[in-house]
Amino acid sequence: MNTTATLHPITKLKSQIEANLQWGESSVWNNYDFEKLSEQIVEKTSVSLSVSTLKRIFGKVSYKSEPSMTTLNALSQFLDYEDWRDFLVKNPVNTETPLP
């Protein structure tokens, strides 16, 4: 039986955004929350991410493609990383995380 799981880097990014905002888990966010997040991202990074894009990232809307590099860079910069690459370097994926 496999008792390890890989925590996807985008999952880490989302968790850090949730912790930074202190609005609770994104699974309970509503449209207003995504609008406020979009506004905060523009204010901090000068990059406009639509509410629809944010909902896709946070799993509120079904979408099979990976986010664009522009989106990942903006979300990383929102958390005070230089860009997505800097986020990845400073948040290595732990492939040996035990499952509960």
Placement of each model-derived feature along the sequence:
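Residue-level signal for alpha-helical context at structural boundaries
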Residues: K55, G59, L72, V93-N94
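Recognition helix of helix-turn-helix/homeodomain-like DNA-binding domains
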Residues: N20-W29, Q40-P67
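A short, Lys/Arg-rich alpha-helix, primarily the initiator
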Residues: M1-S38
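DNA-recognition element of transcription regulators
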Residues: D33-E35, S68-T71
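DNA major-groove recognition helix of helix-turn-helix/homeodomain DNA-binding modules
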Residues: M69-W84
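Defense-system signaling and execution modules centered on TIR/cGAS-STING-like, death/scaffold domains
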Residues: M1-N2, D80-P100
